[in-house]
Amino acid sequence: LMINGYFDLSVGTVMGFTAALAIGLQPLSIPVAIIIAIAAGAGIGAINGFFVAKAKINAFVVTLGSFIGVRGLIYIYTGENALVGQNYEFYSFGASRILGVPTLFLIMLAFALIGNFALRRTAHGRRTYAIGGNVEAAENAGIPVDRTIFLNFMLCGMTAAIGGVLLASRLNAATPGLGWPDTNLMTIATVVLGGTSLTGGSGSVTRTLGGLFTLGVL
């Protein structure tokens, strides 16, 4: 999304809200809870994308509004209390290891590889770079600018939701303050530290991983 020239201030609250859904909806079954949580994240991202790409409202205003709105949803859904998971399999997955390596770390690497491939080897990735570099030139070249921006916001919400579900699995709990406000700033700092321009048009997933590890050491 930042390569596209935009950023999303609602990532942290989306992460916290979807973590709460993944814990609170466990009585329906774990797969249903996970699907609803990820769908909610994608839906919030789609709403952000609609107002930014279609309604042409500033992304800062839109995503700040989403941040506040979703934070309210977290308080309403949790009743301002911590939710504790009741499913051992859900928790054991978050704490599991494969050949001594945490499963969640391997999932992160898998998503990084997929994201890197999508950016470098697909038409959508090339469109993302083009729009971030020069949106007017991209429009003149026939690139579907609005659709690309919309999809990137939706993908941002969906991946934040996946992160929320995985975090809930690791902690086996969700609190009203989980995922925000530090997640938003840390996310932007990690991406910028990895070499992505705040104005868009440059950056990569692999360099962002480098920024993540560097920030972790610091």
What are these regions (language model features)?
Residues 55, 59-122, 148-151, 170-181:
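Transmembrane helix-bundle core of multi-pass membrane transporters
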Residues 114-154:
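Membrane-helix/interface signature in polytopic inner-membrane proteins
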